[in-house]
């Protein structure tokens, strides 16, 4: 029911008992929210790591600051390269843009809680047919002037808006975890490539020293052969040894160039304009403390992102189910309307309207049911993805623990 008025108001509208009752009902219903409340899905977790030794299980702590972990290696060149990843790595920049988009979606979903306010000003000229029946404007050209403000607000009776905010917030948290995962992945890949490159530097230097030694040995063997104190087979053997070592040195150089190119891409630089001078490692590799808990798994941002996507999908079920219930809105409009410019913004030209509206879809050919089933299927898929991420995380921890145990 909408109440309207064209003449000027001369007093307040008396409160009606029915109106207060309706307002109380709206307030009470605003505390409801359809759809399932979120609970983190169970994931199969072993009571202990197979390769754990002194390691232990721990709780997720992906929100902890990892700090500049690469600085423990004490390599200034590595430090500079990793710092550049944050600025120039394209995968990190893309993840950061997606996170900003997710935060904007949160702001957009929260805006639905508040009323809207729109302004409209128009001046139109119109002419009615000369033969029109009734009215005094037949055949005349009329100029209508209007200036108004309109406002609308939707009462979140069934929690549709709240579930939408829950979904967008969880998606933004997943975006933050994705950004952390992109940073960690790029930093880890760069560090791994860098240490492989430095290992190849040492290997290449050793091979070059061997090539020089084998070349001297070949010259000596040839001289001995010319003097008749060495057999031809000794010369052939020395030549084969030199050629084999030369081939290894060339292959090592190719591998080093490929790693250098990979590092260039990670820091967002064209390979043609990027190079790393050969050098030895700045320090020995740090040792992992034997009593360190399994933080490798508990702080993984990819698992946190998968879990947050489950929460977002769960909230979308509530959004879909809220469509089964009617929507309740309040709308109000007021302003000035006149055919005479001199009377436009005067009291007799004022108008207003205010009232609630209730809307309910009666028939949609199964659309709402299909949307609900889609939301449930999306939730089931994210649960499976979360559990798979947990399993993959445990596999990687077990693999690294096994490698650490074998090398100790």
Regions found by a protein language model. Name each.
Residues 2, 23, 28-87, 145, ...:
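Terminal intrinsically disordered/low-complexity segments used for targeting and assembly
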Residues 10-11:
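Glycine-biased, low-complexity coil/linker segments
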Residues 58-63, 71, 86, 167, ...:
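Amphipathic alpha-helical coiled-coil scaffold segments and their short linker/junction regions
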Residues 82, 146-150, 194, 239, ...:
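Membrane-embedded beta-strand positions in outer-membrane beta-barrel channels/transporters
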Residues 93-94, 110-111, 155-183, 233, ...:
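Sec/SRP-type N-terminal targeting helices
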Residues 161, 177-292, 403, 407:
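Periplasmic alpha-helical coiled-coil/stalk elements that build and connect Gram-negative outer-membrane
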